[in-house]
């Protein structure tokens, strides 16, 4: 590979891949190009920055230059790739171009902001860069509206509440974590947030935002309005597919890849939050770690398909932490729930009596790994 490997992106997926590539080959030319500074930070920490009084710069774990030296890389930070000529094996920015033998897209996902009037007033917390842009406003805000009651919205609601702020959490659904589990399972977290003082607005739709002297007025579809100091969009992520689309690579919800992380073009691969692996978008750390291991080998002639075991997803709500695994979103499961003062175990059983999903909380989380071994996948 005389021209080497180019990775577009600098997040967790890109870094995991770099580490695994260097286990395969210490000298192959390896280039990373990204629109940000390329400094390393732990993205899940963004769910706790307010209660821990952290500034954006406090999140930095390793400077880009140190990473480049450690793994023998060429880095091009603060550069936005404009186009890919897949046939010529060339990546282009506005004023530079690079040739490659193999190209990996690790472009991540962007926070979805609902298309409502006043959407420009909504903040997002999907990167260190985004937090840096709004950290002063969020620290100073006393009244915060979080739009979206999924994983990130629930985590942020607890964090802002722990920091002493007045928090309203809004979602279209009738329960929290509605896309992940039924209400009888998520109700424990819902009650705990309410007990902490979080004001829940469920089955509610945001219609518009407008700047007023006292802050921001949020108007619901019901015409009810509330006044807040900051509004955060936690309404999900959208895989970044624009670059792949321009290159003629197949995209659906994400950049379409097979079990080898290969796109519709034989020398272009995708990994991480931007990738749709055999129809599944898996924006979690463990699938990314495994993807990086398999892809690094396959870039050097390996032929091993990615096999993902049953994996735990951790909800980072420290006052009522949850672990979940399996097909928790399935509507045809029968849930067996044991809830006691020390925690909850909820088992989702199929009609054939097989364990297909589970959710555990608090002190019962220690039983997660034993349950994981009995999970039918």
Curated annotation (Swiss-Prot):
Its cofactor is FAD. GO terms for cellular component: cytoplasm. Keywords: Cytoplasm, FAD, Flavoprotein, NAD, Oxidoreductase. Its EC number is 1.18.1.-. Gene3D superfamilies: 3.30.390.120, FAD/NAD(P)-binding domain. It catalyses: 2 reduced [nitric oxide reductase rubredoxin domain] + NAD(+) + H(+) = 2 oxidized [nitric oxide reductase rubredoxin domain] + NADH. SUPFAM superfamilies: FAD/NAD(P)-binding domain. Coiled coil: none annotated. Pathway: Nitrogen metabolism; nitric oxide reduction. It comes from the Bacteria. InterPro entries: FAD-bd_OxRdtase (IPR050260), FAD/NAD-bd_sf (IPR036188), FAD/NAD-binding_dom (IPR023753), NO_rdtase_NorW (IPR023961), Rbx-bd (IPR041364). Pfam families: Pyr_redox_2, Rbx_binding. Belongs to the FAD-dependent oxidoreductase family. One of at least two accessory proteins for anaerobic nitric oxide (NO) reductase. Reduces the rubredoxin moiety of NO reductase. This is Nitric oxide reductase FlRd-NAD(+) reductase. It comes from Salmonella agona (strain SL483). The lineage of its organism: Bacteria, Pseudomonadati, Pseudomonadota, Gammaproteobacteria, Enterobacterales. The gene is norW.
